Regions:
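C-terminal segments of enzyme domains that contribute to small-molecule binding surfaces
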Residues: 3, 99-130, 161-203
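Flexible, glycine/small-residue-enriched loop-and-beta-strand segment within the central core
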Residues: 22-23, 39-131, 168
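Glycine-centered loop/turn positions within well-structured domains
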Residues: 149, 153-155, 163
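Short, T/G/N/S-enriched strand-turn elements that build extracellular solenoid repeat scaffolds
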Residues: 29-32, 54, 73-74, 151
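Beta-rich strand-turn-strand
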Residues: 126-139, 145-149
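Extended, small-residue-rich solenoid/repeat segments and analogous flexible loops
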Residues: 1-43, 105
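Conserved G/P- and acidic residue-centered "switch" motifs that form tight phosphate/ATP-binding loops
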Residues: 141, 159
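Catalytic-loop signature of eukaryotic-like protein kinases
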Residues: 120, 138, 155
Length: 203
């Protein structure tokens, strides 16, 4: 029966335009809730708890080579590059025990705090987002950044550790974009909007 159910789920996903490159990369206890036209490349998914699924929004994608660990959500219209690690725990080895090796410290249990990614977030290649970090809507994370603190909406972050270099738009424009919640508009209507001019878009 489980194999039949899995087959039905895969057929349903295909009809919705959902793509998962390799199901074998998803651990047995990892549960995914994916909206239409969301895509996962060759990504390792190892969520810590079966009762805490990952929710991935419509039209978001994550390219190959990455890992999803302590992560609870990816918003809509997110673009996530290659070799990105989302929800990297800081305490997955016991540094205050006699040995940090799990060969002799197997009884150790790491904490469990989750990261989240907002809507319309662009994360470039080779980024690490630490567990517990919240990345706001519209943020941009530059290549090779290590994000250790929350990122406010529409901020651009680069470096290790990641630091904000500037905002994408003015404060007024950011407030208006957040109020618009354009990512919840029907996709057919979105295609006719002027995405190349923020002021015209917000009128």
């Amino acid at each position: 029966m489980p194999s039949i159910l899995n087959r039905l789920e895969k057929l349903k996903a295909k009809r919705l335009g959902i793509r998962i490159q390799d199901f074998s990369n998803i651990s047995a206890q990892s549960q995914l809730v994916m909206e239409e036209h969301s895509r996962l490349g060759d990504v390792q998914v190892r969520l810590p708890k079966a009762d805490h699924p990952l929710r991935m929004g419509a039209y978001s994608y994550m390219r190959e080579g990455g890992e999803i660990l302590h992560l609870e959500s990816i918003g809509r219209f997110c673009s996530i590059g290659r070799n990105v690690v989302l929800g990297q725990p800081t305490d997955n080895h016991p540094i205050d025990w006699v040995s940090s090796s799990m060969s002799v410290s197997g009884a150790y249990e790491a904490g469990c705090v989750y990261s989240s990614i907002g809507h319309d977030v662009w994360i470039a290649h080779n980024v690490v987002v630490m567990a517990g970090v919240k990345i706001g809507d519209g943020a941009v994370i530059g290549r090779n950044a290590v994000v250790t603190k929350d990122v406010e909406p529409y901020q651009i972050v680069v470096g290790n550790p990641g630091k904000v270099v500037r905002a994408r738009f003015t404060t007024e424009q950011i407030v208006s974009l957040m109020k618009s919640e354009w990512w919840n508009i029907d996709y057919a209507a979105l295609k006719d909007l002027p995405f190349d001019d923020v002021d015209v878009f917000l009128k």
